[in-house]
Amino acid sequence: MAKETVEILIDGGKATPGPPLGPAIGPLGINMMQVVEEINRKTADFEGMKVPVKIIVDTDTRDFEVEVGTPPTTALIMDELKLEKGSQDPGMDKIADISMEQVLKIARMKFDALLSNDYKRAVKEIMGTCVSMGITVNGKDPREVQREVDQGVYDDLLTS
């Protein structure tokens, strides 16, 4: 039961049977379109970003598994807010504001890569990154919003 692993960088939601994917997995004899469809389905939320993808192929049965990595949290935040870079002085210079819904969207994208085991903790991790980037959440300091999350202010949003 030999397994072959192919690691490539794909534009989110835009995998094609052409390069770089085709030449990498073509020789393995698996159905190219099934692989492309699965990659595009799993990377749709990362449209416009380069996403690391790992394709693990069982060379005996021709079964495959697609594992999608995630871009760094800072890249997801900057993409969501259309920013070029974070603040040079995040303690004093606030450069943007992000909504709690956007924070939750990013937490859902990154959930498998985060240390959190629920969305309440995941959004707090994302807000921690906002602190270091000079980004407010709902017009407030992210640390204040983290306390509100602890108090249950956003429970309706986080359980939906």
UniProtKB/Swiss-Prot annotation:
Protein name: Large ribosomal subunit protein uL11
Species of the source: Methanothermobacter thermautotrophicus (strain ATCC 29096 / DSM 1053 / JCM 10044 / NBRC 100330 / Delta H) (Methanobacterium thermoautotrophicum)
Gene Ontology CC terms: large ribosomal subunit
GO molecular function terms noted in the UniProt entry: large ribosomal subunit rRNA binding; structural constituent of ribosome
Pfam families assigned: Ribosomal_L11, Ribosomal_L11_N
Gene3D superfamilies: Ribosomal protein L11, C-terminal domain, Ribosomal protein L11/L12, N-terminal domain
Family: Belongs to the universal ribosomal protein uL11 family.
HAMAP family: Ribosomal_uL11
InterPro entries: Ribosomal_uL11, Ribosomal_uL11_C, Ribosomal_uL11_C_sf, Ribosomal_uL11_CS, Ribosomal_uL11_N, Ribosomal_uL11_N_sf
Protein keywords: Ribonucleoprotein, Ribosomal protein, RNA-binding, rRNA-binding
Function as written in the Swiss-Prot or TrEMBL entry: Forms part of the ribosomal stalk which helps the ribosome interact with GTP-bound translation factors.
GO biological process: translation
Complexes and interactors: Part of the ribosomal stalk of the 50S ribosomal subunit. Interacts with L10 and the large rRNA to form the base of the stalk. L10 forms an elongated spine to which L12 dimers bind in a sequential fashion forming a multimeric L10(L12)X complex.
